[in-house]
């Protein structure tokens, strides 16, 4: 068994959709990034890649490549899932935490879990998504950005 950890941070900006966990969430701002800036899927992707010692998402999907400009991060996560499988691993579980003040995402967590599970072809019961605020502290508390942390466990097939 192997453990991976992933962390991602993105800044809030105007005139962008807010996509988290593959789900569009109504909000006045979105996250800035080369792709769709899905902070949660990026953290999960990094955790999985790290568990298999395959580097990080920057190595596989560089932000200097026009191929990944505004790309749906679900496409990236599906590719990561294939890389993990090709290396001979299966995903045991994923646990993730979203850190942001607003908007509240509780109504979307089930859909996020289902989206992540579908991308990775695993049962929804293997995916945990939680959310918390930063108690108005720091850049997250000032609603300047959002962060996500993820850990995963993979095992050889």
From Swiss-Prot:
EC supergroup of this enzyme: lyase
Cofactor(s) the protein needs: a divalent metal cation
Name of a matching Pfam family: YgbB
Positions annotated to bind 4-CDP-2-C-methyl-D-erythritol 2-phosphate: 8-10, 34-35, 56-58, 132-135, 142
Pathway it works in: Isoprenoid biosynthesis; isopentenyl diphosphate biosynthesis via DXP pathway; isopentenyl diphosphate from 1-deoxy-D-xylulose 5-phosphate: step 4/6
UniProt-listed NCBIfam families: ispF
Name of the protein in its database record: 2-C-methyl-D-erythritol 2,4-cyclodiphosphate synthase
Annotated organism of origin: Prosthecochloris aestuarii (strain DSM 271 / SK 413)
The organism's taxonomic lineage, starting at the top: Bacteria, Pseudomonadati, Chlorobiota, Chlorobiia, Chlorobiales
């Amino acid at each position: 068994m192997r453990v991976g950890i992933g962390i991602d941070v993105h800044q809030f900006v105007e005139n962008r959709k807010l996509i988290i966990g593959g789900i569009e969430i109504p909000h006045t701002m979105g996250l800035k990034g080369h792709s769709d800036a899905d902070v949660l899927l990026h953290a999960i992707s990094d955790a999985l890649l790290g568990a298999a010692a395959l580097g990080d998402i920057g190595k596989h999907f560089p932000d200097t490549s026009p191929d990944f400009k505004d790309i749906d991060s679900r496409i990236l996560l599906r590719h990561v899932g294939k890389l993990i499988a090709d290396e001979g691993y299966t995903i045991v579980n994923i646990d993730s935490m979203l850190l942001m003040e607003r908007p509240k995402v509780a109504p979307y967590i089930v859909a996020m879990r289902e989206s992540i599970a579908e991308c990775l072809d695993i049962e929804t019961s293997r995916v945990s998504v939680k959310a918390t605020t930063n108690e108005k502290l720091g850049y997250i508390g000032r609603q300047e950005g959002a962060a996500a942390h993820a850990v995963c466990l993979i095992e050889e097939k």
